[in-house]
């Protein structure tokens, strides 16, 4: 019978404490051991010898860079680079004339491009607001399309040094 009483006691203790080896009396009187201080730190961090390298003994003043004004920069933006290095003579050869479509193009309509009898349509007729000042002998070479193409190429060549994508360049 003694065995049954011990088993009953253990069962009751397990129900109460969930740990049969620690009784209520031991649990109340036992104190938890202090956590071990692995750094051996007894002073504040800035006075502790174990952490002497955290903060420098002398604080150096960090100077912020001065703000540059417009006078500090060179005229062309950056030294050695001239961003607006385009051939401006192309603009002087082209003169704006009108903002509407020429009447000759309106009369023929889209059949103008499908008609086999038309050998060559000057580019200046298709560009409504640009008139070419060159002679008619050199109209194919010096047309508005030719100037726009060379202007586009010069813009792309100029901006190629900046690794700009073609989609980002606004073409006129």
From Swiss-Prot:
GO BP terms, alphabetized: cell division; homologous chromosome orientation in meiotic metaphase I; meiotic cell cycle; meiotic centromeric cohesion protection in anaphase I; meiotic chromosome segregation; spindle attachment to meiosis I kinetochore
Superkingdom: Eukaryota
Chain positions covered by the region annotation Disordered: 15-43
Ranges annotated as biased composition (Polar residues): 31-43
Compartment annotation: Nucleus; Chromosome, Centromere; Chromosome, Centromere, Kinetochore
An example Gene Ontology CC term for this record: nucleus
Biased composition (Basic residues): 15-30
Key word Secreted present: no
Motif annotated as POLO box domain (PBD)-binding, chain positions: 100-102
Membrane-spanning segments: none
Subcellular location, principal: nucleus
Function statement: Plays an important role in chromosome segregation during meiosis I by allowing meiotic rec8 to establish cohesion at the centromeric central core and thereby promote the side-by-side structure of kinetochores at meiosis I. Enables monopolar attachment during meiosis I. Required to facilitate kinetochore mono-orientation during meiosis I, when kinetochores on sister chromosomes face the same direction and are thus captured and pulled by spindle fibers from the same pole. Acts in collaboration with plo1.
Subunit field text: Interacts with rec8, Interacts with plo1.
Protein name according to UniProt: Monopolar attachment protein 1
Organism for this UniProt entry: Schizosaccharomyces pombe (strain 972 / ATCC 24843)
Designated gene of the protein: moa1
């Amino acid at each position: 019978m003694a065995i049954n009483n011990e088993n009953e006691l253990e069962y009751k203790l397990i129900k109460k404490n969930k740990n049969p080896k620690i009784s209520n009396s031991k649990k109340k009187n036992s104190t938890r051991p202090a956590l071990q201080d692995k750094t051996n730190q007894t002073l504040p961090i800035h006075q502790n010898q174990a952490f002497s390298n955290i903060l420098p003994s002398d604080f150096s003043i960090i100077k912020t860079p001065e703000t540059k004004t417009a006078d500090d920069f060179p005229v062309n933006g950056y030294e050695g680079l001239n961003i607006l290095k385009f051939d401006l003579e192309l603009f002087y050869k082209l003169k704006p004339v009108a903002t509407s479509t020429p009447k000759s193009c309106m009369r023929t309509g889209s059949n103008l491009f499908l008609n086999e009898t038309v050998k060559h349509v000057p580019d200046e007729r298709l560009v409504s607001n640009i008139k070419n000042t060159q002679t008619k002998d050199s109209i194919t070479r010096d047309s508005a399309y030719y100037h726009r193409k060379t202007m586009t190429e010069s813009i792309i060549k100029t901006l190629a040094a900046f690794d700009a994508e073609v989609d980002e360049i606004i073409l006129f």
